[in-house]
Amino acid sequence: MFYLNAHLEINKVVDVVMSLSKKFLKPSVASNQLRLLFTAAERKVNYPGHVPLSPLQRIFLVAGSAIMGLKAPWRGGDMISVLGDASGQPFFLHRLLNKMLVDKTGREILKDKPRMTSKSLNLPFLRTLPPNTLGKIYVDWIDKEHVGPDTRSPTRFVDDPEEAYVMQRYRESHDFYHAICNMPTNIEGELAIKWLEFVNMGLPVGALSALFGPLRLNCEQASRFRRVYIPWSIRNGLNAKTLINVYWEKELTNDIEDVRRRIRIEAAPPLV
């Protein structure tokens, strides 16, 4: 029911965006260039599920999803995903794609284009691994937090297929950041990971969550977050390998301390 309601809210925001763009458009006086600014009718669908947007529609969608994401951060998964799609173009996703293209593992990921699902990750197998392995720690973490790899929204509003995959990979890797850093999914844990993602990869959706999310913390939580977790996130975000270039599926049987050492990331201070 939660998942359905989240998607209904997304569709509501998208419907408002489309109707506003039509309201602003006056065909009798608009030039062809102006029409292209307001309407996506001339734009082609580039991959299954792609929703083309005009520049104005993209602005509306960024604003609407940002407001909804801030209003209800506990539902942030789907609405923040829309914000990530809409705000990543035209600069930020292209820059992240370039970071993958200049990295050997990044190029391998782009060539293979793996998707993370319960089936592809083989969760029953991960439960049989030794307790010190990344795979075992990951599957224990998702069991404890009651999350899973099948709940990530598909990319819809990114025009370029390669950049759309980069956004999908960014989204699907999120739980591995939690698991390898030993960070829960409560508000403080999510914000710490968003700070880490923003500093490390620079997508604006991370900046929005990182900058405005702490407003949802009480005084004690906010003080601890400023003293402990923001410094941890910034230090690790700057020091770590670009996390989009980690081929998590090939690290599952490896010792987690070895993985942390190679990607230069620390476990977070315990969040209790």
Curated annotation (Swiss-Prot):
Enzyme class: lyase
Other noteworthy facts: This protein may be expected to contain an N-terminal transit peptide but none has been predicted.
Residues that hold Zn(2+) according to the record: H174, D175, H178, E190
GO biological process: ubiquinone biosynthetic process
Enzyme Commission code: 4.1.1.130
Function: Lyase that catalyzes the C1-decarboxylation of 4-hydroxy-3-methoxy-5-(all-trans-decaprenyl)benzoic acid into 2-methoxy-6-(all-trans-decaprenyl)phenol during ubiquinone biosynthesis.
Pathway participation: Cofactor biosynthesis; ubiquinone biosynthesis
Pfam families: Coq4
Catalytic activity field: 4-hydroxy-3-methoxy-5-(all-trans-decaprenyl)benzoate + H(+) = 2-methoxy-6-(all-trans-decaprenyl)phenol + CO2
Complex formation: Component of a multi-subunit COQ enzyme complex, composed of at least coq3, coq4, coq5, coq6, coq7 and coq9.
Record's protein name: Ubiquinone biosynthesis protein coq4, mitochondrial
Membrane topology (UniProt): Peripheral membrane protein
Cofactors (names): Zn(2+)
Keywords tagged on the record: Lyase, Membrane, Metal-binding, Mitochondrion, Mitochondrion inner membrane, Ubiquinone biosynthesis, Zinc
GO MF term set: 4-hydroxy-3-methoxy-5-polyprenylbenzoate decarboxylase activity
A Gene Ontology cellular-component term: extrinsic component of mitochondrial inner membrane
Entry annotated with the keyword Membrane: yes
Principal subcellular localisation of the protein: mitochondrion
Organism, as annotated: Schizosaccharomyces pombe (strain 972 / ATCC 24843)
